[in-house]
Amino acid sequence: MACCEPKDNSKKSLWKTSLVFMTVKVLIHYSFHFIVPLFFVKIFFKDNWKEAFAIMLLTMLIDLDHLLASPIFDASRCSIGYHPLHTVYAAIFYLMLSFSPSWKLKAVSIGCLWHLSTDYIDCLL
């Protein structure tokens, strides 16, 4: 390989920095955070779906742990395992909440676990 030839992964990295890719990534990420929970509440919380949807949206507050990082936002950083409320230990706690008899705590559990899933999907993109 000559010194100036692009590496094999240069097309992939060029694609990942393209405006189209970044736009699609942002659309997927935020629709998963704000639209998909509506489907969860319609399935699991039919009687209290509006309250459950509000609770699930409030689970976005776990992103406040990003304020502890420097820089606060880094598009190339994976949140999972980096921020305190995005760790395996936090996920275990969120999972334990799902065993509560309270539907509100179950909504918090599903919201937080879906939030972590969404952030993990973002890491894979």
Positions of PLM-derived features:
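N-terminal membrane-targeting hydrophobic helices
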Residues: 1-125
